[in-house]
Amino acid sequence: MNNFDFNNRTAIITGGAQGFGLDIAKRFLDSGCKVIIWDIDEKLLKSTTEEINNPNLSYNIIDVSNFTQITKTVSEITSKTNIDILINNAGITGPTAPLWKYDVEMWNKIIQINLIGTFNCCRAIVPNMIENNYGRIVNVASVAGKDGNANASAYSSGKAGAIGLTKSLGKELADKNIAVNAVTPAGAKTRILDQMSKEHVQRMLSKVPRGRFLE
């Protein structure tokens, strides 16, 4: 496993109380980074931080679709330290249904979290990175954003939007020592699978040559 030196760096990880976000947080902590995990699930945040028990780990209860809440929290954080790294990992899958039967309210919720949430966090944090001439941003998208999954049009659209946002923002910040990238993982055994129907999970699995999800 590669070793990195993130001493004197501070990272914010959205959706950091479980799954990909939690594993990313642990790697950063192992590398000496100060980590702030953002999640909407207060109970899970508390149990996660208590279990890890690392003085470099803290959390905020954040709804990434709430820009006002984010800007207030960012202001409080940057009054004490810079934000060097942002991992936009928060996301939901929503129900599986064809577009013409998709619940409009749920469609909007998925876009608000998966796409607008990514924008909100970047919009609030990038000014601090520009001021300090340093930043690393990673947006967790999905292979669905490139391929488009049947019966998951909201999720696919939100992740496709996150990929486009990454490309645009990366070009805007290229001369400011701020790198912006996206990762597009396929299926992984996290709690997000619990939001999907068994039929949809099996359809995803059938596309994986090795017949298993990332663990």
Question: What are these regions, as identified by a protein language model?
Answer:
Residues C122, G158, T166:
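Active-site helix of classical SDR
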Residues W100, D147-S153, D175-K176, G211:
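Active-site loop immediately N-terminal to the catalytic Tyr-X3-Lys motif
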Residues W100-F119, Y134, V138, A162, ...:
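Catalytic Tyr-X3-Lys loop
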Residues A97-L99, M106-N108, L193, H200-M204:
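Substrate-binding pocket helix/loop in short-chain dehydrogenase/reductase
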Residues V208-E215:
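A conserved structural motif in NAD(P)-dependent oxidoreductases
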Residues S142:
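Residue(s) in the substrate-gating loop at a strand-loop-helix junction
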Residues P127, K171-D175:
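Alpha-helical segment proximal to the catalytic Tyr-Lys
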